[in-house]
Amino acid sequence: MSLLPYALARPFLFGLDPETAHELTMASLARTQGTLLSAAYCSSKVSDPIELAGLKFSNRVGLAAGLDKNARCIDGLAAMGFGFVEVGTVTPKAQPGNPKPRMFRLPEANALINRLGFNNDGLDAFLANVRKSAVRQKNAKNALLLGLNIGKNAATPIENAVDDYLICLDGVYPHADYVTVNISSPNTKNLRALQSDEALDALLGRIAERRETLAGRHGKRVPIFVKIAPDLDDAQVAVIATTLKRHAMDGVVATNTTLSRDAVKGLRHAEEAGGLSGAPVLEASNRVIGQLRAALGKGFPIIGVGGVMSGLDAVSKIKAGADVVQIYTGLIYKGPALVAEAANSIKNSR
């Protein structure tokens, strides 16, 4: 979608409830992908390849998980010029998420607050959608590097969370270019407790063991990334970095949404519960990225996400220590033109 059509569509979309606007956009994208109408969303892809974790990224800008929770729009999203796309978060069983309203715009801050709670159609429906996407077929002309993001059901006790992650890992493994283990959403009760020292060590130990089994079964070793929060102190980041390396994780996604409201105090909806995304997260996310890079060294892949609203923001993530970046809230505020803007800015910054 070019800048002008999105500029025309945005007032209409922003006149709707945020979740209604999201559902309408995704339904439209799902219906039109692969047709002439999908040209409205298309953007020429910037070529800026990089290899990370044995994967070849066609450029340095990807879509963050959360926009396409059910993998319904993979083909349409691929046409926007992303170097990679991450879909999910998927849980073993379908679940409705938290009560509505659960998504709020803070336009003065180019931000969103959501407390969706991993609403999704479940693993079986998710995998069916992945399998039928055109860009995932063998010998597809426009093959897409695809990440599949996994989580736990809200009804699963936190002490049994590993069971949900293993169920999802078993299911997504044959279909993923990489898998992201989401332990940082603030909208599933106690989920972030999995970032603590002992809990993370136990979880990643089990995931690493299962990955070895799956690698033997499927004849390929799929990289595993772990998505963490921005609301971590220096000591917590250091422990996470050590644990990632101990269990031979392949990369880290930094970061998820924040619980902090320091940057949006006094704004309408600022006190709504949930995770804050968009421009106010940029600084906190970059801080964590920098700490991770210092702790992990040069060769460990970092996907930077949080607050990318412009090409300059994308470059700031790379300078902080990320190898590639992801966008989500920026796409809502700026439209699909942000993909090429960010990718070109990164390419031209070197």
From Swiss-Prot:
Entry's EC annotation: 1.3.5.2
Binding residues for FMN: 65-69, 89, 149, 182, 227, 255, 278, 307, 328-329
Binding locations of substrate: 69, 114-118, 182, 187, 256-257
Listed cofactors: FMN
This protein's pathway: Pyrimidine metabolism; UMP biosynthesis via de novo pathway; orotate from (S)-dihydroorotate (quinone route): step 1/1
UniProt signal peptide: none
Compartments, record wording: Cell membrane
Stated name of the protein: Dihydroorotate dehydrogenase (quinone)
Classification via PANTHER family: DIHYDROOROTATE DEHYDROGENASE (QUINONE), MITOCHONDRIAL (PTHR48109:SF4), DIHYDROOROTATE DEHYDROGENASE (QUINONE), MITOCHONDRIAL-RELATED (PTHR48109)
Cofactor: binding comment: Binds 1 FMN per subunit.
UniProt catalytic activity: (S)-dihydroorotate + a quinone = orotate + a quinol
Gene Ontology CC terms, in alphabetical order: cytoplasm; plasma membrane
Family: Belongs to the dihydroorotate dehydrogenase family. Type 2 subfamily.
Function comment: Catalyzes the conversion of dihydroorotate to orotate with quinone as electron acceptor.
Alphabetized GO MF terms: dihydroorotate dehydrogenase (quinone) activity
Sorted UniProt keywords: Cell membrane, Flavoprotein, FMN, Membrane, Oxidoreductase, Pyrimidine biosynthesis
Catalytic machinery residues: 185 (nucleophile)
Any one Gene Ontology BP term: 'de novo' pyrimidine nucleobase biosynthetic process
Pfam families, sorted: DHO_dh (PF01180)
Location, primary (coarse class): membrane
Membrane topology category: Peripheral membrane protein
Quaternary assembly: Monomer.
Keyword Membrane: yes
Alphabetized NCBIfam families for the sequence: PRK05286.1-1, PRK05286.1-2, PRK05286.1-4, PRK05286.2-5, pyrD_sub2
